[in-house]
UniProtKB/Swiss-Prot annotation:
Organism: Methanosarcina acetivorans (strain ATCC 35395 / DSM 2834 / JCM 12185 / C2A)
GO BP terms: translation
Classification via InterPro entries: NA-bd_OB-fold, Ribosomal_uS17, Ribosomal_uS17_arc/euk, Ribosomal_uS17_archaeal
Keywords per UniProt: Ribonucleoprotein, Ribosomal protein, RNA-binding, rRNA-binding
GO MF annotation, one: structural constituent of ribosome
Annotated stretches, region: 30S ribosomal protein S17: 1-112
CDD domains associated with the record: Ribosomal_uS17 (cd00364)
Similarity remark: Belongs to the universal ribosomal protein uS17 family.
Pfam families from the UniProt entry: Ribosomal_S17
GO cellular component: cytosolic small ribosomal subunit
Protein's name in the database: Small ribosomal subunit protein uS17B
Subunit structure: Part of the 30S ribosomal subunit.
Region (Unknown): 113-486
Length: 486
């Protein structure tokens, strides 16, 4: 996925092979960046967006709110439909009347995200008004259509999308429930093994996932799993004719696997975990090189291996966990915001592998594991800002790993490094006013013990004095914590 040079936008969650896509093709964006609501998606790849803005009225000497309509090109990965809240950017003229391209669809979000955040309250109210008008208009059209009309599933699809977007803005759960019902009707009226069936099943699965996330109703989770499973079956039939629908298969496979992981976490049924791993691997086996969701899938596969280790206590699963995260790190762009988190996860996995494998892994291999873990944390440290909440964790973990390396190698430089990073982690936590947390008490204890070890090696009394000060502070904090709790 290309970096288009615009900060603050939500990147597309799906891939596409459209050459006119700013993210997956070669189209450059420039100039104006505008936000609005889709009021028409009748054209094949173009949409009409309604934009609201404020302008100064010299006649009345006050601000006036006005609207305008803009045509924009919508790449397949944006999936912009009527009722969606979108962001468009100016580009070279793509076709008659269109010099804008959709670069963000706030409505096409993952079911673990929050409701839509509209920039201004007055815009939110206008979007709600527009959506209610669209819903009312589409409902009237549906009533006027014959029961076997080919237009009926299209209108039901549009109605469901508008209702889902109204839920995103207003939080009205009834709109989401109605959206699920109308997507279900649309799917039931769509011809079997058609491309429209595939697309609508995925929309149904996403909406049922939203409903599960909102209500925690297990039946919604099961329905979403069934919808994605049916979407994959539909794709398998379509793929014998053409491979144009591969992005939809990748979406269905990833989302189905994610839901099966949720199901496993709820019921601890090993068959759900096995199915999730199968569909994650189906995604990896089918995804073209450079697919944007591949690192995410690799990370989730690593989590699945952790679950397998918890079930079987087989250390080989921890090795697989490390391999998957390492692959995710290797294919993630160095400028990606996800890279520091992946590096921290890699360091954590290596640490766990070290702790669990002390009695099973050769001594020289244990040292290599520690060095890899330390290097992973060091790389993450170089990529995050000084005010990041992850910095404290990194400082502490580097200290712990360096201490273990000192025990393995007897190199004093590792002990000094451990002490230095423990000091930094304590200072960082002090700045965040978390002095009495159990983690900080553990860090103080580690630092005091490390200073005593350093004193025994170098016989410098300053280390002993500092250690004594740390012990005194530790006593004070333990006393304060005890009184605070009581």
């Amino acid at each position: 996925m290309r970096d288009i040079g615009i900060n603050g936008i939500k990147l597309p969650t799906e891939d596409c092979n459209d050459p006119e896509c700013p993210f997956h093709g070669k189209l450059s964006v420039r100039g104006q960046i505008l936000k609005g609501i889709v009021i028409s998606d009748k054209m094949t790849k173009n949409i009409v967006m309604k934009r609201y803005r404020e302008k100064w009225s010299y006649k009345y000497q006050r601000k006036q709110r006005v609207s305008s309509k803009i045509h924009a090109y919508s790449p397949p990965c944006m999936e912009a439909k009527i009722g969606d809240i979108i962001t468009i950017a100016e580009c070279r003229p793509l076709n008659k009347g269109s010099s804008f391209v959709v670069i963000e669809n706030k409505s096409n979000i993952n079911f673990v995200d929050n409701l839509l955040n509209v920039d201004d309250k007055w815009r939110e109210e206008l979007y709600v008004k527009d959506l209610k008008e669209m819903i009312s208009l589409i409902q009237k059209e549906i009533k006027s259509l014959p029961s076997k009309s080919s237009e009926l599933p299209i209108r039901l699809d549009q109605l469901a999308n508008c209702q889902r977007n109204l839920y995103f803005i207003s939080g009205d759960i009834k709109q989401l429930e109605d959206s699920v019902d109308n997507f279900s009707k649309s799917v039931s009226l769509t011809p079997i093994n058609s491309s429209d069936k595939l697309i609508r099943l995925i929309s149904l699965g996403k909406t049922q996932s939203f409903l599960y996330k909102t209500t925690n109703d297990v039946s919604s989770l099961d329905s979403a799993i069934n919808a994605y499973g049916e979407a994959i079956e539909t794709y398998n039939v379509l793929s014998t004719i053409t491979n144009n629908y591969l992005p939809y298969f990748l979406t269905a496979s990833k989302n189905l696997a994610d839901l099966l992981i949720f199901e496993y976490e709820k019921n601890k049924n090993a068959s759900d975990l096995k199915r999730a791993v199968y569909y994650y691997n189906e995604f990896l086996n089918s995804a073209p090189t450079g697919t944007s969701n591949t690192p995410i899938v690799l990370k989730r596969l690593s989590s699945a291996m952790k679950y397998y280790y918890t079930l079987n206590q087989d250390i080989d699963y921890l090795e697989k966990e490390i391999n998957y995260i390492q692959k995710a790190v290797n294919i993630t762009n160095s400028s990606s915001a996800n890279l520091p988190g992946l590096l921290i996860d890699l360091g954590d996995s290596l640490n766990e592998y070290y702790e669990c494998g002390k009695s099973k892994i050769p001594f020289d291999k244990l040292e290599k594991i520690l060095i890899e873990s330390r290097n992973s944390y060091m790389k993450a440290k170089g990529l995050i800002s000084d005010d990041s909440i992850n910095l404290l964790k990194i400082f502490n973990n580097i200290g712990n790993v360096s201490r273990e390396l000192y025990i393995h190698t007897n190199e004093i430089s590792y002990l000094k490094e451990a002490i230095d990073f423990w000091r930094k982690s304590i200072k960082s936590e002090d700045l965040n006013k978390q002095n009495y947390s159990s983690n900080n008490i553990l860090r103080l204890n580690n630092l005091a013990v490390g200073l005593i070890d350093l004193y025994e090696v170098e016989s410098d009394p300053k280390y002993l004095d500092e250690s004594q000060k740390i012990w005194n502070r530790l006593k004070r904090e333990l006393w304060t914590r005890k009184n605070y709790k009581s």
